[in-house]
Amino acid sequence: MALSKVKLNDTFNKDQLLSTSKYTIQRSTGDNIDIPNYDVQKHLNKLCGMLLITEDANHKFTGLIGILYAMSRLGREDTLKILKDAGYQVRANGVDVITHRQDVNGKEMKFEVLTLVSLTSEVQGNIEIESRKSYKKMLKEMGEVAPEYRHDSPDCGMIVLCVAALVITKLAAGDRSGLTAVIRRANNVLRNEMKRYKGLIPKDIANSFYEVIEKYPHYIDVFVHFGIAQSSTRGGSRVEGIFAGLFMNAYGAGQVMLRWGVLAKSVKNIMLGHASVQAEMEQVVEVYEYAQKLGGEAGFYHILNNPKASLLSLTQFPNFSSVVLGNAAGLGIMGEYRGTPRNQDLYDAAKAYAEQLKENGVINYSVLDLTTEELEAIKNQLNPKDNDVEL
C-alpha cells in the first residue's frame, strides 16, 4: 500500500453534512461564573504579581487568576459574547473590589479582594499574606525593590499568560504529555522574567492552567479569542511581544508555519501539521484548505475528531515518541515507534515513505504550490542544500 493510494475524502463529506444542520447545541457553564470587567484588571494583575514574587509559591489558583486577567483585558461584554457565540448559556457574576477582614496570627487585618465565586476572599487574603513575607525578604536583600521586581509591575499578568500560551500549543494531545516541552520552552523564552520573579515556576503554573482548562473547557474559547485580540494590538510591552509570538506560533499564523506545519521545523508544536503526513500528495492542499475554512481553532477542536486530522496525528499513534508520522513524512525524519499502530498498512506506507525521504534527502516542495516567499522561508528554516530541494 502506497501513501499516494490513500483517499481522504471523508472529511469533506462530513463537513458538508455538519454544515447542513439546522440546530445548535447550547452548553451550560454551570453555576454563576466570574466575568470581570476592565475596572478590576489592575487588581488581577497585582494578584498575578503577588504569586510571582512569592518564593516557592503555591500555584494552585494561578491558572484561574490568569484566565480571569485575560477576561478583564477583553472586558465583560466581549467575554460574554465569545461564550454565547460558542453556544454557552452563561450566568455571569459581576466582579468588584471589596474590603475583607481576616485573622492573621490573632490580629485582624484588612485586605482588598475581589468578589469572585471561583476564588474565596480567604484564599485571596492568603496569597497576599505569603507575598508580603517574600517582599519583606526582598527589602532586606535589596534595600529598595526596583519597579520591575515588584508585584504591581504592569506586565505580571502577561508573564503568567505566556505560560498559558505554551500550554495551549499542547492541548491537542488530550493529556499532559507536552508538559516537559512547555517547561523547556518557558525556561528559554521567560529566562529574563525568571530572574525577576522567584515565584515564576513554569511547571507549577503550567499544571495550574491544564487543570483549569480541564475543569472549565469554555475557557479555551475565551483564551483563543483573547490571544487573537492581544496579538493583533500594536505596541505594548516586551512581554506582550513574547506572548504574541508564542500564541501565534500555537495558533498557526506565525511565519515559521507553512501550510499548517507540513514543512515547519517545529511541527510538533502545530496542531493540524500532525495531520499532514502526505508531503508529496495533493491531499496536503486539501487539508490546508479545510483548515483555512475552519479557522485557526481547527487545530484545537478538530484534530481529535475528524478523520483526516486524526489520521496520522498523536491521537491515532499515541505511543509514537519524539515525532508523529506527520513530522516524519513531511521532513523525512523517523522517530521510534512503540506499540501497535491502529492501521498497520497505513503505518507501513508512511514509514516506508519517510525512510525514503530520509535516505534520499529530498523533499518535493513543488506539490504545495508555494510562493517565492514561502519557499525562501523554508530554505532559511530548514537550511537545505540546493540539491536537497526538488522544485
UniProtKB/Swiss-Prot annotation:
Subunit structure: Homomultimerizes to form the nucleocapsid. Binds to viral genomic RNA. Interacts with the phosphoprotein P. When in a monomeric RNA-free form, interacts with the phosphoprotein (via N-terminus). Interacts with protein M2-1; this interaction allows the association of nucleocapsid with the matrix protein. Interacts with host EIF2AK2/PKR; this interaction inhibits EIF2AK2 phosphorylation of EIF2S1 and blocks EIF2AK2-mediated translation shutoff.
InterPro entries in UniProt: Pneumo_ncap (IPR004930)
Residue numbers of Phosphotyrosine PTMs: Y38
Protein name from the UniProt record: Nucleoprotein
Location of region: Involved in RNA synthesis and encapsidation: 1-364
Record-level GO BP terms: symbiont-mediated suppression of host cytoplasmic pattern recognition receptor signaling pathway via inhibition of MAVS activity; symbiont-mediated suppression of host cytoplasmic pattern recognition receptor signaling pathway via inhibition of MDA-5 activity; symbiont-mediated suppression of host NF-kappaB cascade; symbiont-mediated suppression of host PKR/eIFalpha signaling; symbiont-mediated suppression of host type I interferon-mediated signaling pathway
Interaction with the phosphoprotein: region residues: 244-290, 338-364
Entry keyword annotation includes Ribonucleoprotein: yes
Similarity annotation: Belongs to the paramyxoviruses nucleocapsid family.
Keyword Ligase attached: no
Location in the cell: Virion; Host cytoplasm
Main function: Encapsidates the viral RNA genome by forming a left-handed helical nucleocapsid that protects the RNA from nucleases. RNA replication depends on the availability of soluble nucleoprotein. The encapsidated genomic RNA is termed the NC and serves as template for transcription and replication. Together with the phosphoprotein, sequesters host NF-kappa-B in inclusion bodies (IBs) thereby inhibiting this host defense pathway. May also act as a modulator of the innate immune response by sequestration of host IFIH1/MDA5 and MAVS into IBs.
Effect annotated for changing L391 to E/G: Complete loss of viral RNA synthesis
Pfam families assigned: Pneumo_ncap (PF03246)
Keyword line: Capsid protein, Helical capsid protein, Host cytoplasm, Host-virus interaction, Inhibition of host innate immune response by virus, Inhibition of host interferon signaling pathway by virus, Inhibition of host MAVS by virus, Inhibition of host MDA5 by virus, Inhibition of host NF-kappa-B by virus, Inhibition of host PKR by virus, Inhibition of host RLR pathway by virus, Interferon antiviral system evasion, Phosphoprotein, Ribonucleoprotein, RNA-binding, Viral immunoevasion, Viral nucleoprotein, Virion
Record PTM: Tyrosine phosphorylation modulates viral transcription and replication.
Designated gene of the protein: N
Chief location of this protein within or outside the cell: virion
Molecular functions per Gene Ontology: protein serine/threonine kinase inhibitor activity; RNA binding
GO terms under cellular component: helical viral capsid; host cell cytoplasm; ribonucleoprotein complex; viral nucleocapsid
